[in-house]
Design a protein with these regions (language model features):
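Vicinal oxygen chelate
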Residues: 2-3, 9-17, 45, 58-147, ...
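Short, flexible segments with low predicted structural confidence
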Residues: 15, 52-53, 67, 129
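Short, flexible helix/strand-to-coil boundary loops that buttress conserved ligand/catalytic motifs
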Residues: 26, 57, 81, 118
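Conserved short beta-strand elements that form part of the metal-binding/catalytic scaffold
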Residues: 32-64, 103-111
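Residue-level signal for secondary-structure boundary sites
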Residues: 52, 75-77, 114
């Protein structure tokens, strides 16, 4: 029997101090809808994926450990971070720490190989998103160019 092949991520779980505070914080930065919510968890919908916010962060802030959150407008996030008084971390990427120490890198959809299926983008109201030529070239080199 062969090994299973990893094909993607279903969700990311972030530990936060308080669910309502976390929803308010992330709501200042991003437009989103919830899949569900309880006293100890909330689920931010990303189409065919989600972010699970879980109450109970106890560890220190992340240093190098992070995840890249893909957005439709990276500059809008940069402006929202500034307006919210959130410090962008030094370096060439758009990284920040949330109030609970979760490190998040903001990545623009157009410039990376990550691709949502057209029907998922339509369902999210983002059918207008397209890839930059370099991202299409990188996908084509792997035999994955969009139609």
């Amino acid at each position: 029997m062969g090994k299973a092949r990893a094909v993607g991520l279903n969700h990311i779980a972030l530990e936060v101090g308080d669910i309502e505070e976390a929803l308010a914080f992330y709501g200042r930065l991003f437009e989103f809808t919830l899949r569900g919510k309880s006293e100890n968890a909330a689920f931010i919908d990303l189409g065919d994926q989600f972010i699970a916010l879980q109450k109970g962060r106890k560890q220190p802030s992340d240093d190098g450990r992070h995840f890249g959150l893909v957005v439709d407008d990276k500059e809008a996030v940069r402006q929202a971070l500034a307006a919210a008084g959130v410090k962008v971390l030094p370096g060439r990427f758009l990284d920040f720490l949330d109030p609970w120490g979760n490190r998040i890198e903001i990545v623009g959809y157009d410039n990376i190989q990550f691709t949502k299926a057209p029907h998922v983008l339509r369902g999210m109201g983002l059918a207008r998103l397209v890839k930059a030529p370099q991202a299409i070239k990188e996908l084509a080199e792997k035999g994955m160019a969009p139609d």
